[in-house]
Structure formats: C-alpha cells, structure tokens
C-alpha cells in the first residue's frame, strides 16, 4: 500500500511511523490536499493503462493473437504495467482477479 500524504511537514513527521507500519511506501506530497491530488493523478494513469491494455488485447485477438500470449509478450516488453502483471482486465489471463471471477466481489 502507498500513502500519499498532504499536510504540513511537522504533522507528517508525527504520523509517518504509523503509516510506515501499514504501508510499503509513504510520501509527503506537500500541503493539505496534495495527497489527494497525487492519488487522482495516479488513478488517472491507472485508468488509461487499463483502457489501453483492454484495447490492445482486443485488437490483438481480432488480428489473430491469443490474449494470453500477447499478455505474456507485453509483460516483458515496453507496454508492461501493473495492469498486465497484477490486475489484468481480460478474463482468464490471471487467476484471482475480478475479470477472472466475472467481476464478482471478494478478496
């Protein structure tokens, strides 16, 4: 888990030890609200990556490449992203991700 914290430096230093115990990455982004800005920007990039991966896999399949093979290629090439390796939106590429569970809830 990554924490993106927006507050003054003094308050950040006061709570950092608690956050480090809960997450792998802790960043002080600046003043109040900057943590949310960082989160929104990160989520925008994630959304774009998910859309690009979905479109690329669909195009590849329509042109004759097995989506599993194409995902394997992408995961070791310049198109690699967290989406390909950890949260692939294409069903049956990765186990235990929402797309492979018909988007049913659960952890």
Residue positions per predicted region:
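Internal alpha-helical scaffold of NAD(P)-dependent oxidoreductase catalytic cores
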Residues: 4-38, 44-84
């Amino acid at each position: 888990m990554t924490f993106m914290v927006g507050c003054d430096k003094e308050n950040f230093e006061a709570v950092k030890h608690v956050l480090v115990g809960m997450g792998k990455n802790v960043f002080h982004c600046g003043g109040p609200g900057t943590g949310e800005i960082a989160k929104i920007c990160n989520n925008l990039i994630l959304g774009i990556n998910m859309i690009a991966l979905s479109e690329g896999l669909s195009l590849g399949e329509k042109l004759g490449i097995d989506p599993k093979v194409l995902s394997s290629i992408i995961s070791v090439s310049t198109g690699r992203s967290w989406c390909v390796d950890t949260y692939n939106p294409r069903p049956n590429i990765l186990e235990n991700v929402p797309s492979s569970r018909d988007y049913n809830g659960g952890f």
